[in-house]
């Protein structure tokens, strides 16, 4: 499938691409860039860089610590991360537990569980 991006999406893609190029300086070993297992320190460094940028939870609403991206932005990020050889985001907490707590949890549960997932 070939997508045609509008100007804002192209600007976002360029921003993500620049971020990936900058973060290629992280201590991600050659094995990690080729899909091999990451060390704990590599995972922490990558997640820290994403968290500092506000990109650790692309699909989450901003009010809960996420980036609040739409599906096209998520696709652009995933595509650029893959092209740059960067590791995938962790799935379970960000994609399953967090969204359930955001949707069904009360304020206490959101306060208690969402921060640690990030």
Across the structure, where does each feature detected by a protein language model lie?
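Residue-level signal for inorganic ion chemistry
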Residues: 9, 20, 106
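Glycine-rich flavin
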Residues: 25-118
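Intrinsic disorder at enzyme termini
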Residues: 1-13
């Amino acid at each position: 499938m070939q997508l045609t991006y509008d100007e804002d999406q192209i600007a976002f893609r360029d921003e993500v691409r620049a971020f990936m190029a900058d973060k290629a300086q992280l201590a991600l070993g050659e094995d990690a860039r080729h899909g091999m297992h990451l060390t704990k320190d590599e995972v922490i460094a990558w997640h820290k860089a994403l968290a500092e940028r506000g990109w650790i939870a692309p699909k989450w609403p901003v009010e809960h610590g996420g980036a609040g991206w739409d599906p096209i932005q998520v696709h652009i990020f995933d595509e650029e991360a893959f092209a740059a050889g960067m590791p995938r985001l962790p799935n379970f907490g960000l994609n399953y537990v967090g969204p359930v707590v955001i949707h069904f949890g009360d304020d206490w549960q959101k306060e208690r569980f969402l921060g640690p997932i990030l």
